[in-house]
């Protein structure tokens, strides 16, 4: 291990990132702009946008099983609530 590697922040795994944002992330409004359906017709992945401080962000997320059961809530054009990290606003999740 090099000297600099000791001080680098360890990458956060996806499950930890989602749990942290779900618990402590700030809320904002967003809009679904695209959705991908699975073989059963349930929406499994969404692309969404949200605006913070005049900056438009775009992101995508695979939906959880419970979110997939509410596919109608994630159709393109629907308004959604997202949670984001105020220190890194591009880091967000669909609630």
What spans do the regions from the language model cover?
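Oxidizing extracytosolic/periplasmic lumen-facing domains
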Residues: 1-95
């Amino acid at each position: 291990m090099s000297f600099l590697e000791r001080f680098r922040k360890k990458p956060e795994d996806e499950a930890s990132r989602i749990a942290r944002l779900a618990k402590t992330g700030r809320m904002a409004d967003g809009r679904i702009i695209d959705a991908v359906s699975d073989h059963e017709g349930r929406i499994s992945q969404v692309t969404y946008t949200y605006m913070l401080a005049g900056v438009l962000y775009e992101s995508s997320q695979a939906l959880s099983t419970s979110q997939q059961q509410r596919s109608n809530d994630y159709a393109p054009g629907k308004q959604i609530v997202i949670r984001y990290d105020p220190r890194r606003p591009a880091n967000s999740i669909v609630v």
